[in-house]
Design a protein with these regions (language model features):
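Domain-level signal for soluble alpha/beta catalytic cores
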Residues: 3-6
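Acidic, serine/proline-rich low-complexity intrinsically disordered regions
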Residues: 10-264
Length: 264
């Protein structure tokens, strides 16, 4: 049986890893993977890859993987406008016009300065490195070793995942909220910094990508999934499991606290 608790296993059992993540966090949608490709031909060679027949936002493409279980590959021409392309570095989208934020002035930001500052604040993959991108359910393993793994979850589940990450080798997480174009906070940041990246999905993700109102998005290099799951197993042994049972707002708290922290 393949070891899914450490990244040192000879071959990752992506199906087992995905199933464990889904079960531990009670996920309502499919954990999925994202991978960048220097050549579109390599993306097109993925088994059972789907290619869009219409123009989409990347939020929609991501939704096809996380809600429908599809494996989808895109190039710059499949994505609407420069904003979607810029975050993942496709199509040389980061022109002076894009940096100005002109298309967002009066829509999301009051003036030129605010629109330009927003563009500058985004985490984006540099242009010129990649021709294509693919997303696929993590369990399928079709992307081989993906660049990042992603999943949607409730705030409570996200907090438990973070607790798992912080169980061993604690560090504080400081995440960004760029506002609209929040994909820059999730997959844009994870692809560029190679660190776990949590986001509050924006209007476009919810309107076009099918993201539910109570969902947040985690994007992370896959090795951090192993660390978080190991941490959550340790927390479970201490009695902390998701979903967290309600104790009651009028109860004497001492009995509950004593279970975790002992009696004074």
């Amino acid at each position: 049986m393949t070891d899914t608790t450490t990244p040192t296993a000879k071959a990752t059992d992506w199906a087992a890893l995905s199933a464990e993540l889904e079960q531990t966090l009670r996920l309502r949608s499919i954990p999925f993977a994202m991978k960048m490709f220097e050549r579109r031909e390599d993306m097109e060679a993925i088994p059972r890859i789907r290619r869009p027949s219409a123009v989409h936002t990347l939020d929609q493409v991501v939704g096809q993987a996380s809600r429908l279980g599809w494996t989808v590959g895109v190039t710059a021409e499949d994505l609407v406008g420069a904003q979607c392309r810029a975050v993942v570095g496709l199509g040389g989208a980061k022109t002076d016009d894009w940096r100005s934020g002109r298309h967002m002035k009066g829509v999301w930001f009051e003036d030129d300065a605010g629109a330009a500052a927003h563009q500058a604040a985004m985490h984006c993959v540099p242009d010129g490195q990649f021709e294509a991108l693919a997303v696929s359910p993590l369990a399928s393993g079709r992307l081989g070793e993906p660049d990042i793994a992603l999943f949607y979850a409730t705030p409570g589940a996200m907090m438990y995942f973070i607790n798992g990450l912080q169980w061993s080798g604690y560090k504080r997480f400081d995440w960004s909220v760029v506002g609209e174009s929040a994909c820059a906070d999730s997959w844009g940041r994870a692809l560029t910094t190679r660190t776990p990246s949590l986001s509050i999905p924006c209007f476009a993700e919810r309107r076009y990508g099918g993201v539910l109102d109570d969902e947040m998005l985690m994007a992370t290099p896959p090795e951090h999934l192993f660390r978080a799951l190991a941490g959550m197993k340790a927390l479970a042994r201490n009695g902390f499991r998701y979903p967290f049972p309600q104790y009651g707002v009028q109860q004497d708290v001492r009995a509950g606290m004593a279970v975790s922290y002992g009696k004074d």
